[in-house]
Amino acid sequence: MQRSGNPRVSVVVPTRNEARNLEVVLPAIAAVRPAVHEIIVVDGHSTDDSIGAARRTLPWVRAITQTRKGKGNAMACGFAAATGDVVVMFDADGSADPAEIPAFVSALVAGADFAKGSRFAPGGGSDDITLLRRTGNAGLNGVANALFGTSYTDLCYGYNAFWADLLPLLDLPDPQTPAPAEGMLWGDGFEIETVLNCRVAAAGLRITEVPSVERQRIFGETNLRTFADGTRVLRTLLSEHRRADRRKAARSRH
């Protein structure tokens, strides 16, 4: 893998029971120009034949099944399978606009290591966010920026892209590690997006925000739970800050 002005782009789409949405989303991604290198659908043991729908809709799609459970594990499986130079994180529900993919890639080509989507950067927006979620997001942005010295305006948005050569630095759980008898591995759940935001900041990587407009999901109901998810993000921020401090202390001893 190499960094160039014309990178190969891998789009990773975690999915669980999103068959109807995939029938709309996959052709839209495939229509993006410049064309993406590959689309990887990572299925979370769906019961609605999401993999079958993906393959019928787009025969050249790469469809795999995640090794454990949780969105974070699905992402890690997709990242490990990616063969492109750039990895784009893309939700299956239709809330992200595939036409924005070139803007994320352009930010990376221009010098960023991590392109962070933001609904609150100039030119961004949302058809879906509530006042309560907007307020909570702003508070969590403040915590993240105070802890990590960042300038995030939209910590909780999952539309992001990064150079694939950064994967070792992110230190995500190995997809081949067996699932624990109880609970989940850290990073396997919905905390994955916050974990990534924290780790790229702790590593001192170059972060560029990309304006993005969030749309309403096409079919189905959202899994978002405002208070529970906000609490989880806050716990993740504190945990990742402690992790960064431990690593910094370990480096100073050597």
Q: What is each PLM-predicted segment?
A:
Residues 8-10, 38, 195:
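Cell-envelope/extracellular polymer assembly enzymes that use nucleotide-activated donors
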Residues 1-30:
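N-proximal low-complexity "stem/linker" segments adjacent to membrane-targeting elements
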Residues 37-40, 51-81:
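Conserved donor nucleotide-binding strand/loop of the catalytic core
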Residues 43-51, 94:
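A conserved acidic beta->alpha catalytic loop
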Residues 26, 30, 36-45:
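Short beta-strand/loop segment that forms part of the nucleotide-sugar
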Residues 87:
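Short aromatic/hydrophobic "clamp" motif used to bind/position activated sugar donors
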Residues 67-69, 73-81, 98-186, 190, ...:
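Acceptor/aglycone-binding surface of glycosyltransferases and processive sugar-polymer synthases
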Residues 188, 194-215:
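Catalytic donor-sugar/metal-binding loop of nucleotide-sugar-dependent glycosyltransferases
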